């Protein structure tokens, strides 16, 4: 679930509210209508029986809406337990891990990214049983928050969508409950359910020591594998 707010108090938004209220509109129709409007100013007016007029310059559309009271409420998440992350860094974590998530729904637990928070570190792990990717970063959180440990599995598709939505925001806040996670970036609220179950212990798949260590130029390695993949 995604919730986006447009603050009326910000002068650049140039929003005028004549009457407070709410309406639920068909997402596809509303999105296509807004894309086709030529003028920058849009007026939305809700009439009887939830009929909604959308006008801009000489264009006018009327679509049927639904009572906002029938729309499901967003889950209430305790905002006192907040983990703050640099947006650019967290997007890197997503990029480096979701590539290893499974696309097979037969093992739904592997379609997510296992995120654990312990001792001021966030560890993100993903595997489809053939590939494994892990990223560890330091996190900023209140002292009381650092004493708590978290172990959650977030759907990979949700993280991909989140990465697309948050762009220019400097930081992103993460709040975790028993079965939900909320990401907040300025005026965007992104809710996702958590996958239920136990993630495989991937620590056993990463050797603690090795007898051989190879250091390679990253660019040269990528070029070589790219050429070799032509015949795979």
Predicted regions, residues:
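DNA polymerase sliding clamps and clamp-related checkpoint/processivity subunits
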Residues: 1-100, 121-169, 173-232
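Aromatic- and glycine-enriched pocket-lining scaffold segments that form the walls
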Residues: 108-122
């Amino acid at each position: 679930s995604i919730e986006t707010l447009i603050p009326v108090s910000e002068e650049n938004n140039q929003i005028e509210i004549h009457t407070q209220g709410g309406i639920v509109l068909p997402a596809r129709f509303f999105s296509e209508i807004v894309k086709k409007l030529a003028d920058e100013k849009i007026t939305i007016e809700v009439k009887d029986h939830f009929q909604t007029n959308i006008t801009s310059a000489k264009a006018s559309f009327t679509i049927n809406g639904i009572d906002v009271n029938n729309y499901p409420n967003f889950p209430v998440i305790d905002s006192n337990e907040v983990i703050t992350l640099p947006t650019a860094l967290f997007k890197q974590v997503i990029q480096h891990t979701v590539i290893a998530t499974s696309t097979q729904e037969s093992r739904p637990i592997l379609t997510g990214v296992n995120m654990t928070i312990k001792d001021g570190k966030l560890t993100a792990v993903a595997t489809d049983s053939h590939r494994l990717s892990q990223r560890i970063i330091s996190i900023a959180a209140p002292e009381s928050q650092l004493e708590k440990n978290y172990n959650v599995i977030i759907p990979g598709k949700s993280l991909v969508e989140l990465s697309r939505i948050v762009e220019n925001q400097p930081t992103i806040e993460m709040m975790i409950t028993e079965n939900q996670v909320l990401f907040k970036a300025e005026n965007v609220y992104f809710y996702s359910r958590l996958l239920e179950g136990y993630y495989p212990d991937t620590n056993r798949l990463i050797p603690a020591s090795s007898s051989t260590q190879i250091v390679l130029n990253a660019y040269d390695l990528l070029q070589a594998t790219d050429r070799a993949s032509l015949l795979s």
